[in-house]
């Protein structure tokens, strides 16, 4: 096809610049899908879009290029320095692609209708792809955080709840589970919102105990369920597949069932007698020597764990623990967290 030359060279420059912008943005997303998501189908789709645009990137546009005389070339924006997470980079590049395609679509409609049509088609399809890729990327990021987590703090009602959690995060705790069973909903939401914001600033996971609705309302990273709470499938319908779900288990049978139900991690216990669940029988240390044979999910030992017994449980292969009173009941939550983490990392 021959392109009808546009008498206005500025339009040719504009199309050239936006073709470059769209193709570069597509390459950023493509490489993320290739190296991080390892999704061959997405890579093929994105590569095909790049090539479609490349075939229509005629010399008439490249010859009109004037980067050296463009006074706006190379302009930066303060927001660029704030893109520290992959999701932020992806979102910025999706927006870049969509905006560039819209400009191409508008200015090539008369002189290059084929390019205009291609740009419109890609733009509409990439809106849906953006949602899918960001959801998958978010879940992958949460899973990686989960796997690297050593210590989870489960909260309880406390007069200095926010301060205690903040001290734990400063000490290096990377997962907080908000658990306040007797707290009214309006107070739970207020506290959960503040905790979610704090955890985000420390790049730590934040989950809500039992309440998938509140987890969704405050944009928590997920929800932790007990055996008598709503089914995992129901929780998935509420919070979606881009969030993580944990499940409490108390026997080998429950551990095996959890693996097939679609949760992301499990809590196993109580390993010792605990103040929070005084009527539950403890599993004992020997029970945990069998766990790795039964599940590939990340799992946390829970129940009565403290600085005095944590060395014993490490001897049977326990790598992750969840605690309540060992930190929430400590005189110095910061030092208590540091001591537990130090023992876990030995």
Swiss-Prot record:
It catalyses: 2-[(2R,5Z)-2-carboxy-4-methylthiazol-5(2H)-ylidene]ethyl phosphate + 4-amino-2-methyl-5-(diphosphooxymethyl)pyrimidine + 2 H(+) = thiamine phosphate + CO2 + diphosphate; 2-(2-carboxy-4-methylthiazol-5-yl)ethyl phosphate + 4-amino-2-methyl-5-(diphosphooxymethyl)pyrimidine + 2 H(+) = thiamine phosphate + CO2 + diphosphate; 4-methyl-5-(2-phosphooxyethyl)-thiazole + 4-amino-2-methyl-5-(diphosphooxymethyl)pyrimidine + H(+) = thiamine phosphate + diphosphate. 4-amino-2-methyl-5-(diphosphooxymethyl)pyrimidine binds at residues 177-181, 209, 248, 277. Coiled coil: none annotated. Residues 1-125 are annotated as: Unknown. CDD domains: TMP_TenI. Mg(2+) binds at residues 210, 229. Residues 126-346 are annotated as: Thiamine-phosphate synthase. Keywords: Magnesium, Metal-binding, Thiamine biosynthesis, Transferase. Pathway: Cofactor biosynthesis; thiamine diphosphate biosynthesis; thiamine phosphate from 4-amino-2-methyl-5-diphosphomethylpyrimidine and 4-methyl-5-(2-phosphoethyl)-thiazole: step 1/1. One of its GO terms (molecular function) is thiamine-phosphate diphosphorylase activity. 2-[(2R,5Z)-2-carboxy-4-methylthiazol-5(2H)-ylidene]ethyl phosphate binds at residues 274-276, 304. It comes from the Bacteria. Its EC number is 2.5.1.3. Signal peptide: none annotated. Its cofactor is Mg(2+). Condenses 4-methyl-5-(beta-hydroxyethyl)thiazole monophosphate (THZ-P) and 2-methyl-4-amino-5-hydroxymethyl pyrimidine pyrophosphate (HMP-PP) to form thiamine monophosphate (TMP). Belongs to the thiamine-phosphate synthase family. HAMAP family: TMP_synthase, TMP_synthase_cyanobact. This is Thiamine-phosphate synthase. It comes from Prochlorococcus marinus (strain SARG / CCMP1375 / SS120). The lineage of its organism: Bacteria, Bacillati, Cyanobacteriota, Cyanophyceae, Synechococcales.
């Amino acid at each position: 096809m021959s392109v009808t030359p546009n008498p206005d060279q500025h339009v040719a420059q504009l199309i050239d610049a936006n073709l470059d912008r769209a193709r570069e943005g597509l390459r950023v997303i493509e490489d993320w899908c290739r190296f991080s998501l390892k999704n061959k189908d997405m890579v093929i789709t994105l590569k095909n879009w790049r090539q479609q645009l490349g075939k229509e990137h005629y010399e008439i546009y490249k010859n009109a290029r004037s980067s050296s005389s463009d006074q706006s070339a190379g302009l930066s924006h303060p927001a660029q320095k704030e893109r520290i997470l992959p999701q932020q980079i992806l979102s910025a590049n999706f927006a870049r692609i969509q905006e560039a395609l819209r400009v191409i679509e508008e200015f090539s409609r008369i002189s290059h209708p084929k390019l205009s049509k291609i740009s419109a088609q890609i733009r509409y399809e990439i809106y849906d792809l953006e949602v899918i890729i960001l959801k998958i990327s978010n879940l992958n990021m949460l899973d990686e955080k989960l796997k690297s987590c050593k210590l989870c703090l489960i909260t309880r009602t406390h007069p200095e709840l926010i301060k205690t959690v903040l001290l734990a995060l400063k000490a290096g705790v990377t997962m907080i589970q908000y658990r306040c069973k007797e707290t009214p909903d309006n107070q739970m939401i207020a506290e959960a919102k503040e905790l979610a914001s704090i955890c985000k600033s420390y790049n730590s996971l934040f989950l809500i105990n039992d309440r998938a609705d509140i987890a969704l309302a405050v944009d928590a990273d997920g929800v932790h369920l007990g055996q008598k709470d709503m089914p995992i499938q129901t929780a998935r319908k509420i919070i979606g597949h881009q969030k993580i779900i944990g499940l409490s288990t108390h026997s080998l049978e429950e551990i095996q069932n959890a693996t097939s139900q679609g949760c992301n991690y499990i809590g196993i216990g109580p390993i010792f007698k605990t103040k929070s669940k005084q009527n539950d029988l403890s599993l004992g240390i020997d029970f945990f020597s069998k766990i790795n044979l039964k599940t590939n999910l990340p799992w946390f030992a829970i129940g009565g764990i403290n600085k005095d017994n944590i060395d014993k449980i490490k001897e049977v292969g326990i790598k992750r623990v969840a605690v309540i009173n060992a930190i929430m009941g400590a005189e110095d939550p910061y030092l208590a967290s540091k001591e537990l983490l130090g023992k876990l990392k030995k």
